[in-house]
Structures are given as structure tokens and as C-alpha cells.
From Swiss-Prot:
Belongs to the NAD-dependent glycerol-3-phosphate dehydrogenase family. It comes from Francisella tularensis subsp. novicida (strain U112). This is Glycerol-3-phosphate dehydrogenase [NAD(P)+]. One of its GO terms (molecular function) is NAD binding. The keyword Transmembrane does not apply.
Length: 332
């Protein structure tokens, strides 16, 4: 099934997904919210700013500037903006989207002002539009270079999830489906916070024992919050949570882990953000998760500790001592 797809968001991840759709045989148009970035992609037929390893776009992928005037050409819209821009993108789409068009989101995080799930934002603004989330352990560079990758498509509408699954899947990119859109979102968002935590620990040279403990206890924290928000327990041992958590906490391709690494090595917040020189979703998500956990009375020691380092100038070494000397408990 050949489709025409609009991709809003031309960072590394949006571009990698646009490439995957083009490799799959679809006609794809990609748009950046920065006019000069669009002009560069149109002129050079690549996105060297975010994916320098891809010399030229395939013939089915092109940049587009005025997507609003051409909205009727597209069957589906893929939103791949940072979480900070998600709500405004959906609000703009409301003015142009047609009844037969539906949305796929590749954005991970929570709404920055209300701390709502992004699916809740989309459903509130576009209540009759089908919505699916694509998430899981996937670095953009590897997907763009057609290395084997497996992800999850989550939607309340299983038929739409299967449609999106078929849209993307080929011999290099395998999509599974789930109707647990809450669990898939919570896992994909909170793991970015814990990747910062893992980076801090690595920067302080705490070793692999600490790394393993952090991932395991971090997974328990994600699960506690997810269950409180209405997720299914089994989702958290799948690709959208455990898979993504393992990947993002363990490899420096992750901007969140690199950011934490710089903090652990002694940089200030601003120095570390400047060094990463790209969006660090976990920095913003930490505030959302902290407030959600407090609202729902969910204990998340690692997330709270990371929040204190990021927003209350707590010393990481003092935080580690506090974590290790907390009241002793049963694991479960």
C-alpha cells in the first residue's frame, strides 16, 4: 500500500522515520519549523544538520515548506517534534487536518504545561482523529542506516495500530502493536529521565553494579507510575519500556545519557546542555514526572533524586548517599 505521508519535525528521529517510510515505498514530505532548515534540505536534498551519515534523500523523500497549502495531498501525518512543540503542532493541525487524515506520533514526553500524556492532548484537540504512537528502543542513526530495529505501535484503535504497523515494517524495521497507549507513553518518557541518572552515575565512575541496579530499580519506578495512570503491567517488560530503558541508559548515542555524563563529570546544567547542543527531553520530562508522581502519591526515589540534581542544585554525591541509606525494604 503506497501512501502519501507528511512528517512534521525534521530532527534526527523525524528524518530517520521519513527515510524508513520512503524506503518502504511511500511518498514522503518532511517539514522543519525553521525556514532556513527547510531551505537547506530543499537545496541539498539531505539533512546533514541532524543526519550527516545520509548523503542524499531517496527519490520518494523531499522537504516541503508550505505544508498547510498542500495538506489535502496526504493520507497520514507523522508528528516528530520535541515534546515542547507537540501541543502547538496539534493545535495548528486542527486548522487544516481533513476528516480522512489521521496522526502518528513519534514524540516522547509529557505536555510541558499540564503534564498530560501527549495522546490526551491530541484526543482533546482532535477528538475524531485516530492517533497512534510509535515508540521503542531506536537510535535515529541506526534506523537511517537500515540496521535492524524493533519498535511498538500503540493505539486505542487496534485496527489503526495494525495499519501503521504495515505502513512502516520491512526487513530492517519490525513493528509490534499494543492497545496500551498509556504504558507505552509512560515508559518512553520516563526512561529519558533515568538515562540522565545513568549518565550521572557513569560520569562519577560508579561502575556496572550501580548501572544494573539503576536500570532495575528505575524500571520498578516506571511501572509504579504507569499502573497508577492506568497502564497494563506486562507493557513494562516490552520494547516500549524495558527495551527503550536498556538502550537509552547504556549508550552515549543517547543525548539524555550524555547530558547526565557531563553533569557527573562536574559540568553545570547550562554547560552540559550546551555541550549536548540538542534537545535533552529528559531534562524537561523530569519536572513533569516529579509533579505527576507527587500528584498521584507514587514514590519514585531515583526520579526524585534526579529532579533535585536538575532543579534544586543538589550535589550528586550527597544524593547517592541518601539513596543508599534509605530505610531498608522488601524488593517488591
Amino acid at each position: 500500500m503506497q501512501k502519501n505521508i507528511l512528517v512534521l519535525g525534521a530532527g534526527a528521529w523525524g528524518t530517520a522515520l521519513a527515510l524508513q517510510l520512503a524506503y518502504r515505498g511511500h511518498n514522503v514530505r518532511i517539514n522543519s519549523w525553521k525556514a532556513e532548515h527547510n531551505e537547506q534540505m530543499l537545496k541539498d536534498n539531505n539533512n546533514h544538520k541532524y543526519l550527516p551519515s545520509i548523503e542524499k534523500f531517496p527519490s520518494r523523500l523531499k522537504a516541503i515548506q508550505d505544508w498547510q497549502a498542500n495538506i489535502s495531498e496526504f493520507d497520514n501525518i507523522l508528528v516528530a517534534t520535541p515534546s515542547s512543540g507537540f501541543k502547538n503542532t496539534i493545535l495548528e493541525l486542527k486548522e487544516y487536518i481533513l476528516p480522512q487524515q489521521n496522526i502518528i506520533s513519534a514524540t516522547k514526553g509529557f505536555c510541558h504545561d499540564s503534564y498530560a500524556l501527549l495522546s490526551e492532548i491530541a484526543e482533546d484537540i482532535l477528538p475524531t482523529t485516530k492517533f497512534a504512537l510509535l515508540t521503542g528502543p531506536s537510535f535515529a542513526k541506526e534506523l537511517a542506516n537500515q540496521l535492524p530495529t524493533a519498535v511498538v505501535v500503540a493505539s486505542k484503535d487496534i485496527a489503526y495500530a495494525r495499519y501503521v504497523q504495515e505502513l512502516f515494517s520491512n526487513e530492517n524495521f519490525r513493528c509490534y502493536t499494543t492497545t496500551d497507549i498509556i504504558g507505552a507513553q509512560v515508559g518512553g518518557a520516563v526512561k529519558n529521565v533515568l538515562a540522565i541518572t545513568a549518565g550521572i552515575a557513569a560520569g562519577m565512575e560508579f561502575g556496572v553494579n550501580a548501572h544494573a541496579a539503576l536500570i532495575t530499580r528505575g524500571l520498578a519506578e516506571i511501572k509504579k507510575l504507569g499502573l497508577k495512570l492506568g497502564a497494563n503491567s506486562e507493557t513494562f517488560i516490552g520494547l516500549s519500556c524495558l527495551g527503550d530503558l536498556l538502550l537509552t541508559c547504556s549508550d552515549n548515542q543517547s543525548r539524555n545519557r550524555r547530558f547526565g555524563l557531563y553533569l557527573g563529570q562536574g559540568m553545570t546544567i547550562q554547560q552540559a546542555l550546551k555541550e549536548v547542543n540538542n534537545v535533552v527531553e529528559g531534562y524537561f520530562t523530569a519536572k513533569a514526572v516529579y509533579n505527576l508522581a507527587k500528584k498521584h502519591n507514587v514514590e519514585m526515589p531515583l526520579v526524585f533524586a534526579t529532579y533535585r540534581i536538575l532543579y534544586e542544585a543538589a550535589d550528586p554525591r550527597d544524593i547517592v548517599k541518601e539513596l543508599m541509606t534509605r530505610q531498608l525494604k522488601n524488593e517488591n
